[in-house]
Amino acid sequence: RYIAVSWARDVYKRQELIDIMDLGCRINHKPHELSGGEKQRVAIARSLVNSPALILADEPTGNLDEDTSKHVLNYLFQAIHNFSKSIILVTHSKYVANYCNKKYDLINGILV
């Protein structure tokens, strides 16, 4: 029973991420057939599928258009808030940084 419940939950989580990242129409495509933004969304979904307590993200919206970036960031930070997750995020975008509750700058190799 426990394994079946766990498996069903995993399938649901995978499908939820496929839907959120708008990847349903690309599910059977090979990696080399995906655009840069689609590959980025796959990477984000893969990082979330096991519900990690800590997410490390380096330029998570780097290859995404503005609308997709907003959608992904809203989902990511909603999940962090709702499920008590933490994220360490590196970005050059002030827009993306504004989603974070603590911000640090790296100046000459020193965090300030």
Which role does the model predict for each range below?
Residues V49-A53:
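A short, proline-enriched helix->beta-strand linker immediately N-terminal to the Walker B motif
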Residues I44:
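Hydrophobic anchor residue at the start of the ABC signature
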Residues I55-D58:
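Catalytic Walker B motif of ABC-type/P-loop ATPase nucleotide-binding domains
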Residues R1-A8, Y12:
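Single conserved hydrophobic/aromatic residue that forms the stacking wall/gate
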Residues K30-L34, E38:
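Conserved ABC ATPase signature
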Residues D19, I27-K30:
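Signature (C-motif/LSGGQ) region and adjacent switch/coupling loops
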Residues Y75-L89, A97:
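Conserved catalytic loops of ABC-family nucleotide-binding domains
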